[in-house]
Amino acid sequence: MKTVTVRDLVVGEGAPKIIVSLMGKTITDVKSEALAYREADFDILEWRVDHFANVTTAESVLEAAGAIQEIITDKPLLFTFRSAKEGGEQALTTGQYIALNRAAVDSGLVDMIDLELFTGDDEVKATVGYAHQHNVAVIMSNHDFHKTPAAEEIVQRLRKMQELGADIPKIAVMPQTKADVLTLLTATVEMQERYADRPIITMSMSKTGVISRLAGEVFGSAATFGAVKKASAPGQISVADLRTVLTILHQA
């Protein structure tokens, strides 16, 4: 399976990489959060732009992205506008969403963008191509905060992301039962062993699903989300604890 290299970070080999989310509402919040994150042990910084109040003004967004890059200079920056329908804070039209991601790509300030699978195939394909022309990697994502689809459906969505050109397909689902967590892990193994030719990221959310955030190296998920201060999704654990567990599993 091929790995994905972003700056000097190789995703898809060794222990799963740790992603943390920055969620400031104003440029002042963004800067203070970035400063607070500087000493934390993580691999990729995700900026959750849907938390940023002034998201429809490209200048403000790019000013904030520049501020993050000045403060955290040594980590890849993942630019993510999570839509309201997939658990995010704000709603944009498809046109606004694509334009925002293209502006981020154009800026040269971000290393990766997150594109939601169900944005529309044509828009997604074109935006993936655009990102790749500018040497920006794409995490393609899907989130279900209500349930865990059947394993076949999870695999199908991950394969679709791969077909649409994602560098890293990602899915997060909500378990209603312990068996749902096994469904997600089963789908992860099947995708990783039978279909994936690139790294994937999967997780089962909430406290019930926390094992999926820790055992990625065993089942085939290449990255996991941790919390520095406030969790960006249910079930995230602190980055320090996360690194300890990932290292134990890696060295076992």
Swiss-Prot record:
Pfam families in UniProt: DHquinase_I (PF01487)
Entry's EC annotation: 4.2.1.10
Example GO biological process: amino acid biosynthetic process
Stored InterPro entries: 3-dehydroquinate_DH_AS, Aldolase_TIM, DHquinase_I, Type-I_3-dehydroquinase
Keywords: Amino-acid biosynthesis, Aromatic amino acid biosynthesis, Lyase, Schiff base
Active-site annotation: 143, 170
EC class: lyase
A GO molecular-function descriptor: 3-dehydroquinate dehydratase activity
CDD domains: DHQase_I
Annotated residues for binding of 3-dehydroquinate: 21, 46-48, 82, 213, 232, 236
Catalytic activity reported: 3-dehydroquinate = 3-dehydroshikimate + H2O
Function, in words: Involved in the third step of the chorismate pathway, which leads to the biosynthesis of aromatic amino acids. Catalyzes the cis-dehydration of 3-dehydroquinate (DHQ) and introduces the first double bond of the aromatic ring to yield 3-dehydroshikimate.
Family: Belongs to the type-I 3-dehydroquinase family.
Assembly: Homodimer.
Name listed for the protein in its UniProt record: 3-dehydroquinate dehydratase
Species annotation: Salmonella choleraesuis (strain SC-B67)
Gene: aroD
